[in-house]
Amino acid sequence: MKILFPDFSDITGLPNDDSLLLDQHRMLFFGDAHDWLICQQAMSAQFLDYLQHGLELSVPNLLVTGIDRPYQLHETLQPRQLPQALRSRHQLHLLPLMGNAGAHRFAQALRQAGHAVYVEAPDYATFLQLNQKLGFRAVIAALFGEHKLARGCDLQQPGAAEQLWQTSRATQFVLKPNQSTGGFANQVVAHVGELSAHAAQLQGMDLLEEMIPEVVASLSVHIHVAADGRCTLLPLAEQVMAGPAAANGIAYPVALSAATRAALHADLAVFCGYLASVTYRGNCNLDIVVDAAGRHYFIEANARLAAGAVPRAVLSRLFDGCLPAYRFVERKLPGLHRCQEADVLHASLATLDMGRRSGTLVVQSQKLAFDKLAYVCFGDDAAAVSEQEQGFLNALQQPELAQVA
């Protein structure tokens, strides 16, 4: 069961412009059919236009919430003003509960009745809030404007919001089961509409991560941090692997473009500088992939550093400080890969419903032009969440770890 819950009052970070707000909401009127359209009343003159756009959906039920008494709806919007198509094609329901609480309770009741409720909302914060309260375990930021696809997109241009919506709907993800290695048992989620089925299969600590399309090369950069803090890098050209041979560990030289090489070296310089500043000494290596556009992504840095027994809090600050160099959030230790506080959207979600050790920690870098989104999803299998992983979730509540580096 799919619910569309666009709520004007919950939009954040947008100008106070009615046309822009409506355009933002039109993004939600494309895609899969919904079973319910939930509206919050008190939209005055905008409300009728809002319902008109709702006609683009195949929604059999319209629920209006945020009212003290049912007749309040008709004080603002007289029945004769409702489009004939709306009266004939939709069932109008009134929920005399205030604000979002009404939608929460209604959707929760549906879920308790056995429905797999998936709630869409106009902005990422509301989406997280609604779905987390429902216990939905796979959170997808790619549906909404905070996703990287929205950067530089002028939603006031005709059709811009619709194009953004369609593009984000086409984003593919990979669902990695807990304890998977080498890509074993990974599943490709080709469309966000498939997530409901996948979410029901989550157990323990799984990861849903955005796919990097068209990976053309993978590198392993070895770093040695000397006692005096100096960092030594092995030449990149000697470590590049490409094509099917990369999976077998066979190295072949790959001619990276000058721009890619320069950007990579710049990020490595930032990373190495911060390594030295946190008094890390010894060896580590960073695995890197390069896509067809020449963009590079750092992966699995934590696995290498954790092997060196770097203190957890130090690593957390390390990745905060070298954010421009870090473009991937690893599965096993999400706390280490937090970005700055503004980039950790609703970090408190990590502690949500921890009585059953379920919840979702969402980490997203918003400073990079081409970052990768990853979501650590906790299922209902309490035993699968290790003591170490639980420690990271607890650490997120400590004020000193929530400070912006």
Task: Give the label of every model feature segment.
Residues 147-150, 172-175, 188-215, 401-404:
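Conserved ATP-binding module of the ATP-grasp superfamily
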Residues 319-405:
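Peripheral (often C-terminal) accessory segments that flank ATP-dependent C-N-forming ligase machineries
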Residues 26, 39-151, 159:
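Conserved N-proximal alpha/beta basic substrate-recognition cap immediately N-terminal to
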Residues 211, 246-295, 332-357:
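A long amphipathic alpha-helix within ATP-dependent nucleotide-binding catalytic cores
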Residues 17-32:
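Histidine-anchored nucleotide/phosphate-binding helix
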Residues 1-15:
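Nucleotide-activated donor-dependent transferases that construct or modify glycoconjugates
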Residues 214-215, 220-273, 279, 302-329:
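ATP-dependent carboxylate/phosphate-activation module, predominantly the ATP-grasp catalytic core
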